[in-house]
From Swiss-Prot:
InterPro entries with a match to the protein in the record: PAPS_reduct_dom (IPR002500), Rossmann-like_a/b/a_fold (IPR014729)
The protein's Enzyme Commission number: 2.7.7.2
Disulfide bonds: none
Record-level GO cellular component terms: cytosol; nucleus
Catalytic activity: FMN + ATP + H(+) = FAD + diphosphate
Coiled-coil regions listed: none
Taxonomic superkingdom: Eukaryota
Organism: Schizosaccharomyces pombe (strain 972 / ATCC 24843)
Membrane-spanning residues: none
EC class of the enzyme, as a word: transferase
Pathway: Cofactor biosynthesis; FAD biosynthesis; FAD from FMN: step 1/1
Function of the molecule: Adenylates FMN to FAD.
Annotated keywords: ATP-binding, FAD, Flavoprotein, FMN, Nucleotide-binding, Nucleotidyltransferase, Transferase
Name of the protein in its database record: Probable FAD synthase
Amino acid sequence: MDELERVYQSIKNIFTHSAPSEKLVGLQNRLSISLRFIEYAFETYQPERLAMSFNGGKDCLVLFLLCIYYLKEKYKEQAQAKLSNIPFVFVRPRDEFPEMDDFVNECQSKYRLNIIKISLPMKEAFCKFLKEHKHIQAILIGIRRLDPHGLHRIAFEVTDKGWPKFMRIQPILDWSYTEIWDLLLETNTKYCSLYDRGYTSLGGVSDTSPNPALKNPDGTYSPAYLLSDGSLERAGRNNTVPFSRTNSRFLYDSGASSYASSEVS
């Protein structure tokens, strides 16, 4: 079984479980909503006009798994070719962890990805990327509400004034910290090794530390998935923001026509 098929079957098993626990039912609901966003994104832009922001963190990894599931469901044996043609943009922190770079390289090899690494500040990085990939109109982003500037985001929105123009597609906004880890563990997906050393939110070396809430009496740290209070996810980062469980204002069932009205041309 190849890696894409493994991911597809592991998510399919969540949907088809004969006696799902309360946790799995919640995960089924969360998956269903996000997959509708992803379906609309791929139907509107087609894989040829989409890119994905990917730094190897847990959130973009979950979004990536959902995209694999959709591509396998839609394109069957052609899913790998579709996936390999999508540009994955890795905006590298100035002081990145070697483990993050190693994990991105591992994903590139394992899933046969077209990863484009850019060592510039975020805005300049996307300016450079879009200048070199003029056909790209929309970018999938694994932002969640706990992230800085994530609280009032919506699933589909054009970039802010002053940024290069593209459609931001943000299908996992309302996933909780626990739900992110539930999916990664349920699908037995390999993740960046830093998470097993107590890091719960990854940035650069200078602004990221193991989460103090996971520190053990002997000075070691428990794995990230054992953090019980999701509001402490960014406790190892600067500029933490409180978590608010707010449903997206841009729900799929509000009508697909409202998406098209703000489509990037």
